[in-house]
Amino acid sequence: MMKTLSSLLLLFSVSLQAAPIERVISLAPHATEIAYAAGLGDKLIAVSEMSDYPEAAKKLEKVSNYKGINLEKIITLKPDLIIAWPAGNPAKELEKLEQFGFKIYYSQTKSLKDIGDNIEQLSQYSDDPQIGLNNARDYRTHLEALRAKYQNLPKTRYFYQLSDTPIITVAGQNWPTEVFRFCGGENVFDGASAPYPQVSIEQVILKRPQAMFVSPHAIQNNGMWSPWVEEIPALKNAHFWQLDADWLNRPTPRTLLAIEQVCEHFASIEQKR
């Protein structure tokens, strides 16, 4: 494979940095959504395997998935810009793309603010930058409206389950923790050393969360918590909800929908107090 890559590199050794941005590749679902929001939809030529929004993204060639990046295909497609996800794309493969001279925009999202910033920064590569600037402005305006609406929600201790075999959750500052925090959520596993720790049912029972959230596609055993209704306040009080995984787990303008969904659930708890 490396011999083939080297041959391709020699063929395309001209500098890509100085070329106008006409051909764009996205390596993550959220990056694809951000690209469309930034006005780059007409320039996208390939995306990641799970890029399914907006609808037009489904028709594009696929060059990456959870296993890695198809370097040979990307080199053949000769993109002017690659939108990468440093938290999800293999670092060594991104380094190789850099060595080949490709221009890479790293879509880092550690805060809700970063979503608007990513849209705005990528808009410079659009033929009509105003599209991205308008979408970034609309996102920020809507975010502040939600902040004003839900700023007085009380603190609620929650548990967010990403999968059931094993049970995986989120810790620390890792996405989508900020969505829950925006709504007054306090992660019961916030202090875990791993970013996405594996936990046990016993640990969840001991943490006594007031609310529990799951993603429908990640939960295969719908009855796994049934025996523990009396031990976990969230279950005893029927504060157990499914969330739209795409809204929540992808840092895009649709995160606003996730915020409203989570905040409304926390608000319903407050109404019962």
UniProtKB/Swiss-Prot annotation:
Disulfide bonds: C183-C263
UniProt cross-references to InterPro entries, sorted A to Z: ABC_Transporter_SBP, ABC_transptr_periplasmic_BD, ABC_transptr_vit_B12-bd, Vit_B12_bind_prot
GO biological process, one term: cobalamin transport
Gene3D superfamilies, per database record: Nitrogenase molybdenum iron protein domain
Feature type site, description Important for BtuC binding: E72, E202
Database matches in SUPFAM superfamilies: Helical backbone' metal receptor
GO molecular function, one term: cobalamin binding
TM spans (from-to): none
Keywords assigned by UniProt, alphabetized: Disulfide bond, Periplasm, Signal, Transport
Localisation: Periplasm
Pfam annotation, one family: Peripla_BP_2
GO cellular component terms, A-Z: periplasmic space
Domain Fe/B12 periplasmic-binding residue range list: 23-273
Predominant subcellular localization, coarse grouping: periplasm
Span of the signal peptide: 1-18
Entry's family note: Belongs to the BtuF family.
Function: Part of the ABC transporter complex BtuCDF involved in vitamin B12 import. Binds vitamin B12 and delivers it to the periplasmic surface of BtuC.
PANTHER family registered for this protein in UniProt: MOLYBDATE-BINDING PROTEIN MOLA (PTHR30535:SF34), VITAMIN B12-BINDING PROTEIN (PTHR30535)
Subunit-structure text: The complex is composed of two ATP-binding proteins (BtuD), two transmembrane proteins (BtuC) and a solute-binding protein (BtuF).
Protein name: Vitamin B12-binding protein
Species this protein is from: Vibrio vulnificus (strain CMCP6)
